[in-house]
Amino acid sequence: MNSNTKIIFVTGGVVSSLGKGVTAASLATLLESRGLNVTMMKLDPYINVDPGTMSPLQHGEVFVTEDGAETDLDLGHYERFIRNKMTQANNFTTGKVYQSVLRRERKGDYLGATIQVIPHITDEIKRRICSGIADDVDVAIVEIGGTVGDIESQPFLEAIRQLRIELGRNRTLFVHLTLLPYIKVAGEIKTKPTQHSVKELRGIGIQADVLVCRCEKKFDDSEKRKIALFTNVDQDCIFTAEDVDTIYEVPLKYNQQGFDAKLVELLNLNAKEADLSEWQNVVNTIRDVKGEVTIAMVGKYVSLTEAYKSLNEALYNAGYKKGVKVKIKFVDSEDVNENNVESYFKDVAAILVPGGFGSRGVEGKIISIKYARENQIPFLGICLGMQLAVIEYARNILGIKDAHSSELEPTTANPVIGLITEWQAEDGTVHQRTHSSDLGGTMRLGGYKCVLKQGSRAREIYQADEVVERHRHRYEVNSNYVERLEEAGLIFSGRSEDNKLMELIEIPQHKWFIACQAHPEFTSTPRYGHKLFESYIQAAIENSNN
């Protein structure tokens, strides 16, 4: 971080899930539209080292960065809103901070000192914030996870309080997001929760510079005056975060209120006028959709749609590009069997099986894949979805009835999917893994090149000889079965650069049947979409019309 970089800290109060991530990303979008180089960071107060081993039903999606970090789903928002790509430096947790401090303590780096939250933990938080910001960055927006008042968040709040003192008011800004409940029976907006949230923040030693008030409806100047009086925040630094039809409207709403202009003023930024024409085009495209197409997503985390956040957004973005609204029908794979499979898919235009781990619900996914293959329904498989598509093909086309994955059935005699014991990273380093290795951080993670087969549908879709997609898996197609699968009509249309790992499959006789080992949803954005998803949605539209 250079001596001119400004930092905006975004905190949240009253309740969680107010949309801190979207607010932070929207502010970054606005500043980027003014010609500034903006990066973002998420600080998570949980004690896990990273979210890699956490249940998606508790934490939501694990977003994978290009350099292979398993991170919070908010980093997905960041990449969809701004152009800069996130790295492992853009997200860290309490667990990671303590891990670093304790490792140094074991090495004797603290020279026998008593290790305490202050200064050792807070110093490590400050170090990670400052070292994670590149020298060419004009503004860094740092989101503090959790809610003010949570015991877990206190070391992070203390660290940013200290950074305000060390860097000065001209280089730091505190933006606090709170809730203004609207009581319909009384027809009133209540400001008391916001007052108490700001008071709680002040008790920690932080005075909010800007307030963002989440509310169902706009509030008038009388409410603003009341909030300003009791929170010690200037009235012109209080903004509304009202409910919108799509999160991509949020930057435009903030711009209309003059939010970005106020940030430029408060931080004395050398910025040009905002050019939001590209972002306005995104919103116009969303508003202009005419038709609707229904996609069945067959998974085991469907009770929490946040578990598939990037995938949902990739489907929606592809739909916008094709002029349709994508409706996702979430199907719990545990409920699907041979007797009821048709009832789940008779009204859908396409079927998708996403990534996942573990054996629960696997047979329901395989039955769904078989139904898509046999009934010429456009199908997209991702990660585990590709592995199960290979298993289904081996069972029902090759006739290997006990074909399985050694992850799901360790004693299977025909492991068409097996553990990757060794692979080479993009930088040339060789990674190795065994069945006894730790689960956390030991997968094939991050961006890897995939070489596309000439004449394949995948090559036609991507319009490239090779692509880079992000991975998060331990298991791959067993190379011992590849030749037999190809002879039976399955095409491996994408392979790793060294030709050892199978990355893409397709069935040429099928209307649209593609599965990939990578997670292409992580690189889809509302500005640019993603070619694979757009082709998939186009196939769904054509199938729906027929």
UniProtKB/Swiss-Prot annotation:
Entries under SUPFAM superfamilies matching the protein: Class I glutamine amidotransferase-like (SSF52317), P-loop containing nucleoside triphosphate hydrolases (SSF52540)
Ranges in coiled-coil conformation: none
Residues annotated as signal peptide: none
Binding site for L-glutamine: G356, L384, G385, M386, Q387, E407, R474
Sites where the protein binds Mg(2+): D74, E143
Modes of activity regulation: Allosterically activated by GTP, when glutamine is the substrate; GTP has no effect on the reaction when ammonia is the substrate. The allosteric effector GTP functions by stabilizing the protein conformation that binds the tetrahedral intermediate(s) formed during glutamine hydrolysis. Inhibited by the product CTP, via allosteric rather than competitive inhibition.
GO cellular component, as recorded: cytosol
Molecular function as annotated in GO: ATP binding; CTP synthase activity; glutaminase activity; identical protein binding; metal ion binding
Limits of the Glutamine amidotransferase type-1 domain: 294-546
Its EC number(s): 6.3.4.2
Domain of life of the native organism: Bacteria
Note: CTPSs have evolved a hybrid strategy for distinguishing between UTP and CTP. The overlapping regions of the product feedback inhibitory and substrate sites recognize a common feature in both compounds, the triphosphate moiety. To differentiate isosteric substrate and product pyrimidine rings, an additional pocket far from the expected kinase/ligase catalytic site, specifically recognizes the cytosine and ribose portions of the product inhibitor.
Similarity comment: family membership: Belongs to the CTP synthase family.
Subunit architecture: Homotetramer.
Name of the protein in question: CTP synthase
Gene (UniProt): pyrG
